[in-house]
Amino acid sequence: MTQAPSAENLFANVEPLNFSAVRLMSLRDDLELEPASGFFFHGTFDGHPNYWLVTNWHVLAGRNADQPGQALHSKGALPSGIRVQLLLRFNQPEYLNRNAEILFQDQFLSLYDNEGHALWYQHVRRNDVDVAVVNLGRYVAERFYLVGINEVPARNDMAIEIGNEVFILGYPLGFTHFVNTPIWKRGSIASEPHIETAETKLRVVIDATTRGGMSG
């Protein structure tokens, strides 16, 4: 029996943010709607440690955040679930007799229960804050290797100034270099980040050549 590979050996030189990002596909039953991006956040649920999947409100709602009456899909279909591809933890039985091979599995996450109640969470201001989260649950956290973005050591020496270089992680048009690792798109801070008004709130404009599929 071959010993299962360890995360320390396989990922020693890998940027950990690559495992905080996740590629999404919104679905209406079996119909693929739109590719998108998201990331993991380690928090709590009902007082217990938990992982959350964070993406944009418009990805899960399937509606334009600025015009919520407008569906994003050309046929007007709204998502009933999303498909994500997750890295199996190395203690899972699928790794037995495998030689340093890493395995990913598709995981379907329903967005609504049988009575039509949403299983995802939005801001109290709904589409005005284009952010939504999905509780991944204990099963997913125990079976898959997840890295919360807040578990990656922060760079406290990074200044947020206009003109500074930034990178946007995601999956342009659903593309990935290796199964689920994101593409890093280079950009720059294009607005003054230290001026806040009632209109700008905490928004910062980023100048970058992004593509559809990087929402999230």
Task: List where the protein language model places each region.
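Cytochrome P450 catalytic-core helices
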Residues: 55
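A conserved glycine-rich beta-strand in the N-terminal activation segment of trypsin-fold
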Residues: 31-52
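Conserved G/P- and acidic residue-centered "switch" motifs that form tight phosphate/ATP-binding loops
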Residues: 215
